[in-house]
Amino acid sequence: MEAPTYSSKQVAEMLGVSPKQIPEESRKDAYTPDDIWELRTTLDRFPARLGHRRQLFLNFKGGTGKTSLSTSYAWRLAELGYAVLLIDLDSQGHATKCLGYEGEDFEKTLLDVLVRKTPLAKVIQKSSLPNLDFVPSNLTMSTVDLALMPMAGREFKLRNALKDVEAQYDVVVFDAPPSFGLLNLNALMAANDLFVPVLADFLSFHGLKLLFETVQSLEEDLNHVLDHVFIVVNSFNATFKLAKEALEALQTHYPEFLLPTIIRQCTKFAQASSEGRPVFVADPSSKGANDIQAMIDNILPRLVAAAAVAQTKGTQQAG
């Protein structure tokens, strides 16, 4: 995918300034991602630090729009100035495609890292945004669970692989397949935050129950406690009575995890993914783009606060 261009209004929104604050010598009709990065440096407009988050998008139920959501979320974080690594865990390579690339064009995937001990840095690819990198996936990833089975410490392979590169990134986003196996167990063990995209239907409850049981078992058996679990209602249509009833049920049974932001049903969102473009490139003014931005606005203060607490604890322990 070619690098997008942005208007002065869009650039000002990303930088958190008014268009008039953009230096006159830097003003132009269309800005590239590199132009924006230079402006960030000139104006010193970098976002609040998040403390190297590792965030997993996962639901054991398929068809929830998870990949469209995770890739557009990662893209938008990068537009806002965060250094982001998107890791495609699904052998179908949909996250790779949503960034405008074909998985088959890449020789190496995460399989090479987890099984063949290839350094993760050698598998990471550059996207059309200077601060968004990705790890591609293709059908070779379909054998990763089987290959991990006989290995010692198999559930920690991904966490260990990240150690050499995660300091370069504010956020690592994992896009996982809708299944439970060793690869997704690795992702859960590596993650700080879990995003669970759901549709407003009662079938989603079955997947949620199993997922939360899995999270609880990780806490009890492997002593891994997630910092945050965010349930995100995706593709919501308020004209459907059943959708409203399902949303009310989610609010009743999972109030502490359910994000107040709802991603409304948006044709342009789905179309953008099929075209291999994040919704913020295809139509930044669409309902899908606005709702994902609202979701980010909702969770960022929590993540910034968590990073500040962690930094304080680290300083106290060092002292």
From Swiss-Prot:
It comes from the Bacteria. Transmembrane segments: none annotated. GO terms for biological process: cell division. Keywords: ATP-binding, Cell cycle, Cell division, Cytoplasm, Nucleotide-binding. Disruption phenotype: Deletion results in division defects with the formation of filamentous cells and chromosome-free minicells. It causes reduced formation of Z-rings and incorrect positioning of the few Z-rings formed. Deletion does not affect chromosome replication and segregation. Inactivation affects adventurous (A) gliding motility. Pfam families: AAA_31. ATP binds at K61, G62, G63, T64, G65, K66, T67, S68. It is found in: Cytoplasm. CDD domains: ParAB_family. The keyword Lyase does not apply. Changing D90A: Lack of activity. Cannot complement the deletion mutant. Interacts with FtsZ in pull-down experiments. Spatial regulator of cell division that is involved in identifying the incipient division site, recruiting FtsZ to the division site and stabilizing the Z-ring. Binds ATP and GTP. This is Cell division protein PomZ. The lineage of its organism: Bacteria, Pseudomonadati, Myxococcota, Myxococcia, Myxococcales.
